[in-house]
């Protein structure tokens, strides 16, 4: 039996926690740092120098030689540049290890080398990173050694946000300010801050390293671009929550240990629906820390996989025909004195503050469904949304029977006199306990579902940063809170006004509530009748962030400027085009150099066999039939390959980012599908010893 792991002892050992700060800083300095962490403001440079020295000393004691400003540019992944603590030797030639407050607070990476949507050019490259004091520094050990990572925001020389974190932090402040107005109106005078808490459920696939290395599509695109279905997929429903394989379990064990050391509260692990698909879920944290930690989770998943001769696939759709991966974004809002604004209590019909919060959220989601849809858009997610494995591309809200009934009563009569209860679940077995049921069931097809004391936004893609969805959620809810607070603060009769607002908002926005089957065709038709947007792709959603309505929202709360939004729209088009271009070129490479030559060779063998058999006096009917089938599909594949080459060349020559992106969507992707179809059919009829790449059966079942 392996040595017992003391989780309490190792948890956070690679993190410069508040506890470690308290041990290493004077009381005066510590209190100043804690004040800025909790309430904002600036540290004096003297204090910053003291904190920097303490942080450096701790890092060096743990083997660190370098530090980095760890930030999240608009690539959606993290970025870092390593600087050593080494400084100029003293007069005696002794090397000093130094780290100043200025180096802690500010860095200067090249802003022109990251996506900026035209905000930064090569001749105006300066950008700044700024220390996010609310997210703790941590140590990462890799081939580079031990690096002190300092979470930072990233902006241009002219002040525009060039990252995912800066708008998130702005949105958190906006939400806190507006939510505080609401809770104070209801008598919570002790609250000084309201925090959005987030818990993302991270799905992923594992694949054997050697098989991965034989698939150019997995290496370059992160997903398979060719592949016939395996004889067995997920139809037996035996993988979800099934027994975890030894190799996968060993990987999960090491992953948990790595994450616990980094202060990530990894809580749940299990097999997901598709073969070789799994999930890890943490405990809730403050939104910006949850965003940082989710990036660490994804990086650790890849890093630990290497140690086990595996590769971790975070793409939303690595394999056709089986479920892809998402990232359920659980979101709640809580005051700093412990009040969860999304807790309905035992009698939600009488919980007026909760009903107002719920009404505001319904208003926010209905009014800005397009923005919420856009916040979960990426190229990979286009393969999932609306495909009977993930929420539809139509935004709706699931409340469950209890709350939907409360809303119905309020809309129809202005009052909710009664509330449905869950009752008892009786198992009928004397040795099993009976227990209280929840008041409502779960709906796995809903994109935005209330689940007891939080909302679960289920559209987010597995490879995507959760910063944008939470920025959008915070912003749209802050706006609804602001409008309600404006009215309530001026109201002559508070009780009457709050009831009027609740009924008005619920009546106006009840169309967004849907408790039924989001996968059904009937819902698509019903959503259209209700006037709900059905935005089917990433690039169709892109323009939603630059509408006058969106710009007014984000500018009102200082989250984005119009220029920042326009740059992000441009980046969306560029990202889409570049991604599809990589996929198209990979298909051209695989089909032209590997698959078609192998099939042509096999067709030659069949032709020789037909000739030999006929010369021997036999009919060769089966061989002839096989040859004709292979030859026909081969010709179809070669023609499709030529077409893909032509349209890819045309796409690459298009100048405008938006025009180019739509050409890739409407023309190049169609040509890619046309090439895949005959090649997947060929895989089913060509000798397996000749087929040049691992099959779905190999990839999903040899882990």
Residue ranges and their predicted role:
Residues 47-51, 71-73, 102-103, 210, ...:
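Active-site-proximal loop/turn and secondary-structure-junction residues that shape catalytic pockets
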Residues 64, 68-70, 293-307, 333, ...:
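Hydrophobic/aromatic-rich, well-ordered segments within soluble, folded domains that form packed cores
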């Amino acid at each position: 039996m392996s040595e017992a792991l003391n989780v309490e002892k190792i948890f956070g050992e690679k993190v410069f926690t508040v506890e470690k700060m308290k041990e290493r800083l004077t009381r005066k300095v510590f209190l100043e740092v804690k004040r800025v962490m909790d309430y904002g403001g600036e540290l004096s440079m003297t204090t910053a120098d003291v904190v920097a020295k303490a942080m450096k000393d701790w890092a060096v004691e743990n083997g660190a030689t370098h530090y980095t400003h760890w930030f999240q540019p608009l690539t959606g992944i993290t970025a870092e540049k390593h600087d050593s603590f080494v400084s100029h030797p003293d007069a005696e030639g002794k090397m000093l290890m130094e780290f100043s407050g200025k180096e802690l607070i500010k860095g200067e990476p090249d802003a022109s080398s990251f996506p900026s949507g035209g905000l930064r050019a090569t001749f105006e490259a300066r950008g700044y990173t700024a220390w996010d004091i609310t997210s703790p520094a941590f140590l990462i050990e890799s081939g580079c050694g031990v690096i002190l990572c300092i979470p930072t925001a990233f902006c241009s020389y002219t002040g525009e946000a060039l990252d995912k974190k800066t708008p998130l932090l702005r949105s958190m402040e906006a939400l806190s300010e507006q939510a505080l107005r609401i809770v104070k109106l209801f008598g919570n005078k002790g609250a000084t801050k309201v925090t959005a808490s987030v818990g993302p459920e991270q799905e992923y696939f594992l694949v054997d390293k050697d098989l991965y290395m034989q698939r150019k599509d997995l290496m370059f695109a992160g997903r398979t671009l060719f592949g016939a279905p395996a004889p067995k997929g997920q139809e037996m429903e035996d993988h979800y929550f099934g027994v975890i394989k030894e190799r996968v379990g060993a990987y999960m064990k090491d992953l948990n240990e790595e994450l616990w050391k980094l202060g990530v509260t990894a809580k749940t692990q299990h097999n997901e629906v598709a073969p070789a698909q799994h999930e890890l879920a943490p405990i809730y944290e403050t939104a910006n820390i949850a965003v940082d930690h989710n990036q660490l989770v994804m990086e650790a998943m890849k890093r630990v996989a290497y140690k086990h001769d595996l590769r971790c696939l975070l793409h939303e759709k690595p394999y056709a025909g089986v479920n892809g991966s998402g990232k359920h974004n659980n979101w709640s809002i809580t005051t700093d004195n412990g009040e969860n604004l999304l807790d309905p209590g035992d009698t939600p019909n009488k919980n007026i503050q909760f009903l107002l919060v719920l009404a505001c959220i319904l208003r926010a989601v209905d009014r800005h469904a397009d923005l919420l849809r856009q916040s979960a858009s990426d190229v990979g997610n286009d393969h999932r949304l609306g495909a009977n494995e993930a929420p539809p591309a139509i935004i709706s809200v699931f409340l469950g029977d209890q709350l939907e009934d409360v809303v119905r009563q309020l809309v129809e009569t202005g009052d909710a006199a009664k509330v449905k209860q869950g009752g008892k679940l009786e198992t009928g077995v004397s040795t099993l306990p009976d227990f209280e049921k929840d008041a409502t069931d779960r709906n796995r097809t809903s994109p935005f579902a209330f689940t007891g004391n939080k909302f679960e936004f289920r559209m987010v893609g597995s490879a995507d940063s959760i910063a944008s969805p939470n920025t959008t959620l915070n912003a749209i809810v802050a706006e609804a809170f602001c409008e309600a607070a404006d009215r309530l603060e001026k109201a002559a009769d508070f009780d009457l006004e709050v009831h009027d607002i609740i009924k008005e908002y619920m009546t106006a926005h009840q169309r967004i509530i849907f408790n039924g089957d989001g996968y059904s065709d009937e819902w698509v038709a019903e959503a259209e009748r209700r006037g709900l947007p059905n935005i089917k792709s990433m690039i169709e959603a892109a323009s939603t962030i630059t509408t006058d309505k969106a710009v007014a929202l984000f500018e009102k709360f200082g989250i984005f400027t119009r220029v920042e939004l326009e740059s992000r729209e441009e980046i969306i088009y560029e990202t889409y085009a570049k991604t599809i271009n990589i996929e198209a070129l990979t298909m051209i490479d695989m089909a032209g150099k590997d698959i078609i030559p192998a099939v042509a060779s096999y067709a030659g063998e069949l032709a020789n066999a037909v000739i030999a058999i006929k010369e021997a006096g036999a009919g060769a009917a089966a061989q002839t039939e096989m040859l004709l089938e292979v030859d026909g599909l081969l010709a179809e594949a070669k023609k499709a390959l030529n077409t893909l080459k032509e349209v890819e060349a045309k796409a690459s020559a298009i100048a405008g980012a938006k025009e180019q992106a739509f050409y890739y969507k409407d023309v190049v992707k169609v040509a890619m599908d046309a090439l895949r179809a005959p090649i997947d059919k060929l895989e089913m009829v060509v000798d397996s010893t000749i087929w040049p790449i691992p099959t779905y059966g190999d990839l999903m079942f040899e882990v």
